[in-house]
Amino acid sequence: MSALGGQARGGDGINWKGTSVGIFILLVAILITYAIEQSMIPQGLFGGLQGVALVFPLIGIIVGGALIGFGVHFVPVGGAPAAMGQAPGIATGVAMLAAGAGLAGLFGGAWAWTATGDFWITILGGGIGGGLMMAITCLMVNLTYVFAMGVPAASGKVNKDPITGYTFPEFKSQGTEGHGLPFISYIGGVMGGFLTALGGTLIYLELLLVYQPGLEQLLGSSAGSVEPLAVSLAGIFAIGFFLVNAVLSAYNITGTIEGPHDPKFKRVPRAIIGCAVASAVCGLVAILIVVAI
């Protein structure tokens, strides 16, 4: 059963009752953040932050979480069966592989922000970092499958590659669900790495833009003195957000997935909603870190 109350055994549909509750929670988180931004909550409870935007960063965090949930479903993951050449995909778990792409993206995005200070270049740089990491990973995986294990790339979900038109049945070994990384899975991996890293970098940058002025007010210090702390906190929370959304997506996938051509890809809307709700709640908590209590 999914986090949104989906059908048992990994059904593809959306449970609208659970989705309605999730959207309500998301809206409540946004309203609370708006109240803090406008200092509408009494000073005895929260002090508020003067002149610091909070609602738009939270919305950015929600969008980033949704991008992570969306991108994870592109990544070809085969788990233990793939390690034995009995299923297509990369021989690891969904969350671990997605987290690797996300960390690569965070490094790329952090470097781009330091070098340029431009918002769009930063999130694009993060996305490119994640996509490049997945491109190299998928290439080395296929080299290992073909030249070390001696198995060609063959999908078990479709009979023909949607991009190249190559057929798979004659290359698929008996008793397996396929093996290797077909071209569509390779492209899916690169797209998934780009989207997940894009979302993770967006979350990092939104948190950083809240923490830098927020810590200045909270600690009464200069911008230069709080910058290392702001960068550290934003990085820690961004990694945490990434893992939360990657694990939620992994539960939604329930096992292995070959990429965008896999029937499990139809579950994407459910993952996007779940990740958006989780990001809203976690984002509210992350923002409260710099609110005077």
Pin down the residues of each PLM region.
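Extended, charged low-complexity segments
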Residues: 216-217, 223, 227, 242-293
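Membrane-water interface at loop-to-transmembrane-helix junctions
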Residues: 8-22, 162-197, 221-231, 263-277
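Membrane-helix interface motif
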Residues: 32-43, 103-112, 198-217, 247-253, ...
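Alpha-helical transmembrane segments
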Residues: 49-57, 61, 119-138, 225-241
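Short, non-helical or kinked segments that cap or interrupt transmembrane helices
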Residues: 77-96, 214, 253-265, 269
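C-terminal ends of transmembrane helices
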Residues: 5-6, 68-82, 137-146, 247-261
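Membrane-interface helix-loop-helix junctions at boundaries between adjacent transmembrane segments
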Residues: 78-92, 96-187
